[in-house]
């Protein structure tokens, strides 16, 4: 019987700032039970020393029968979502999701936008701010967010800056907490989220949805582990769906993503602009949009987890990035 290790950080309600991206205990428990029902052994590990010890001690001749589900998000480091993929690749152990290189790259929103722009993907102008400057290069109003955070960390309604006075009041505080900052034009349209499942050259796009929030801004104040405070609207015009599907498939291919990613867009005059790519999306049935997009397609949560595991094993068999680790296991 094959074994799935859920390598995870577990959300701490007493420290929401640092653990906002982490999965809840309820989600980890649901994933455990669901994967176990698929016929796998399941082990959940949330201590870094224990994770590295267990992985290092998997018998070298049996590592192809283990797979690590990457749910470690960490904090502050620009490499934090790559810890598990890098360790697994080095040790020659299968893992779910994208490689360490994709994880590091997509966590840097500014570099990702520069790359996507160079590949012909529509993105807004942007600038990276590492220290205070008297005014942005982009015209007001602008939207300001941390360059390397997820789950809307560091984002509130005050991140929309209308004029010079608000800039001078807001930017020093944000730089102190979340440097560097990404500065973008404020887009007035609706947000859209797109899920892409699969490995290179075999991607599928999930049902596409608008993400609506009470204030119109997707910020940390509406993130919850107990309920979904946003709403998904799947009534997206066919022409827009086709454009987003084509663009999202290109993005997945350009990045070389594996397993699953979520891509977020925002409209301006009904034209979609890519905001960011999340290579480690959540898998909660309560608060994670990827799982909701999947279930909208008429398939079950267990089918989603099974597919993600199968894609991880498939990647292990076919992708050359594992070769060094495999050779050490002989």
State what each model feature region is:
Residues 1-94, 101, 105-107, 311, ...:
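ATP-binding N-terminal substructure of ATP-dependent carboxylate-amine bond-forming enzymes
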Residues 2-8, 58-62, 104-182, 188:
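Active-site nucleotide/adenylate-binding loops and adjacent lid/helix of ATP-dependent enzymes
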Residues 36, 89, 117, 175, ...:
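Anion (oxyanion) recognition and catalysis
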Residues 42, 94-95, 123, 142, ...:
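Hydrophobic beta-strand scaffold residues
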Residues 129, 155-163, 196-199, 268, ...:
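Short beta-strand-to-turn element immediately C-terminal to the catalytic PLP-Schiff-base lysine
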Residues 164-243, 249, 267, 271-273:
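Phosphate-binding site of ATP-dependent enzymes
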Residues 237-330:
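ATP-dependent carboxylate activation and anion-phosphoryl transfer catalytic cores
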């Amino acid at each position: 019987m094959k074994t799935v290790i859920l390598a995870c950080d577990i959300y701490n309600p007493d420290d929401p700032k640092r653990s906002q991206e982490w999965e809840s205990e309820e989600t980890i428990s649901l994933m455990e039970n669901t994967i176990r029902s698929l016929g796998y052994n399941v082990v959940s590990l949330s201590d870094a020393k224990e994770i590295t010890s267990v992985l290092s001690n998997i018998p070298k001749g049996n590592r192809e029968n283990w797979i690590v589900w990457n749910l470690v998000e960490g904090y502050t480091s620009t490499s934090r979502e790559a810890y598990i993929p890098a360790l697994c690749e080095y040790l020659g152990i299968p893992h779910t999701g994208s490689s360490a290189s994709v994880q590091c790259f997509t966590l840097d929103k500014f570099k990702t936008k520069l790359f996507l722009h160079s590949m012909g993907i529509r993105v807004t102008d942007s600038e990276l701010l590492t220290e205070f400057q008297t005014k942005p290069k982009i015209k007001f109003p602008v939207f300001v967010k941390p360059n390397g955070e997820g789950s809307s960390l560091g984002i509130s309604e005050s991140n929309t800056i209308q004029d010079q006075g608000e800039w001078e009041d807001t930017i020093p505080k944000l730089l102190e907490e979340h440097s560097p900052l990404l500065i973008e034009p404020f887009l007035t349209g609706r947000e859209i989220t797109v899920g892409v499942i699969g490995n290179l050259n075999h991607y599928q796009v999930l049902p596409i949805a608008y993400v609506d929030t009470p204030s119109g801004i997707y910020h940390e104040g509406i993130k919850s582990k107990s309920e979904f405070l946003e709403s998904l609207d799947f009534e997206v015009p066919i022409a827009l769906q086709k454009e987003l599907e084509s663009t999202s498939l290109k993005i997945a291919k350009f990045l070389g993503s594996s397993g699953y990613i979520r891509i977020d867009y925002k409209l301006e005059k009904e034209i979609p602009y890519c905001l960011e790519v999340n290579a480690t999306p959540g898998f909660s049935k309560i608060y994670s949009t990827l799982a909701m997009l999947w279930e909208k397609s008429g398939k079950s949560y267990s089918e989603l987890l099974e597919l993600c595991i199968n894609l991880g094993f498939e990647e292990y068999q076919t992708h050359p990035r594992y070769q060094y680790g495999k050779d050490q296991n002989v």
